[in-house]
Amino acid sequence: MRDTEDMAALGQQGRPVDEVIAELTDKRSGDVKWSDGKTFGMVYDGGPSVHEVAEQAARLYLHENALNTQAFPSLRQIQSDVVGWTADLLNGDENTAGFLTSGGTESILCGVLAARKRGLAERNITEPEMVLSESAHAAFHKAADNFGLTVHKAPVRDDYTANVEAMASMVNDNTVLVVGSAPQYPQGVQDDIPSIAALAKSVDANCHVDACMGGFVLPFAERIGRDISPWDFRVDGVTTISADIHKLGYAPKGVSVILHNTKESRKYQTFVFDDWLGGFYASPNMQGTRSGLPMACAWAVMQHLGIDGYIDLTQQTLVNADLMRAGIMAVDGVRVLGEGQFHLVAMAAEPDSGIDMFALGDALLERGWYHDRQTPPDNLHSTVSNTNTGAIDQYLVDLAECVATVGTTDDRSTTYATLE
């Protein structure tokens, strides 16, 4: 094994395959061990057969490039299939259209860009604005920064849902997009999508529903009898929806879907250019070259699981999450934020308990349990999935023991995504 000091420059001589793989294997030793069920988020495990079908699809499409589907027509069909299946799950119709992207952030970027371009083309809006809740994903702020939109951010209600009345006061003639979440990430609660969509429609703005977390949970939760308030294309005024297949769709990273209620809406996220020496250039999203690997993996996983497979995984996920919520509420000194009914759980200290939640996170991490950290208030966030099956009971034992002994920490940093 070479020292890291030797890695500042690429070696003159190549290295044997087994040596390279051995070093990569060693590098992983400090990563979270997600396969033991002790990581809440980041990786979503659909089980051995899902691994197998994804790995075989990955080998078949390791080098294929969706930049030009004339060369790889199978990728055009794969994208069409996956988009169509997802649109059907989200109650689209024959007019619903979309594209695959690399993940939820890119899907959100595409939705915001389409809203901005439509606002300019159809409403002559040159100073576009977006209205959202403070619980909406940070990617909307990234999109606003990239594409030059002004963001109006409304506070959440006491139950952490979007405050639609506050949002209504921010909507004006320059509004091109109003955002709702199904569910929102921080506390896992679902916004009032019909009211948000009506608000957008009142000024002829787009309404984007961020279902990156819920797109492959809510359709199946509804099928097993959960009470799901309206959120998808059945809601009048919903223009675009983002849904991540690489989360609770159990496909490998990174693949997501951006759906539009019409093909006319979809055209606003695309870019076409033919005034250069290289010929016709068109791209449906933020990428140029697009790996066929995640697209093929998504197709394979969805075909392998089918509706029944997703129902089973969703049922187990919700059992895990319900068990975690009930267990947390039974531990003195900690509580669950919001009335989330799905798979996202945010755990905070009871007021006046004196518990330092980030110190609690440190104590749980010492026992192998990994959470994201959020504030305000300081809380530990869990994205529960099938991955955590069989681990929740031990988690609750460890949680109770750690709560009883936890101290304090000076580390107040929160985590969702990092630069390096």
Predicted regions and their residues:
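Active-site pre-lysine segment of PLP-dependent enzymes
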Residues: 164-166, 190-202, 214-240
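PLP-dependent enzyme catalytic core of the Aspartate aminotransferase-like
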Residues: 383-420
